[in-house]
Amino acid sequence: MRGPLIVLVALAVLAWLSWEVMQRRAPQEIPASAAPDSAGSGVRAVRLYFASPNGDSLVAETRELVEPATFHDRVATLVAELDRGPRGRGVAALPAGTAVLHVYMDDRGLLTLDVSGAFRRGFHGGSTAEYLAIASLVRTLGANLPEVRRVLIVCAGRPLATLGGHLPLDRPLEVSDWP
């Protein structure tokens, strides 16, 4: 008699736990009208640049994103969105898996951007693909971070002479040169 009672209690507990789990939903995507987050930043529109479908230029895409609290997180969020690729027309220009490791910003507008090794390892293209990858990154950062005037790209903590052999990356890139 004791065995069936234990099974019945166990089933009741399991049913209660299942009901509790079902009541807690996964977080929903934040609507554009969301209230500010705990840092007071809220949601803002960002402009991302992707390769055009025919691969000869960049196309802009606007997204509503939660504004991160720190500068590092703002940069990391922009790069992560580029890595996710476009929602509309266009093609991701960054090598897949590119992520921000570190960000250094000086008082003269120089952003030193340390990206993961996937940036270099994942690149398999020619001069146009290289241009589009760098332009996508620099234009997106410049469009959304007005304090950034120049970008120096570093890969996994080491200087990067070039991505694909065509564009020099061993010196800072002027944002204004990538309109």
Tell me what each language-model feature is.
Residues 1-179:
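Bimodal "functional hotspot" detector
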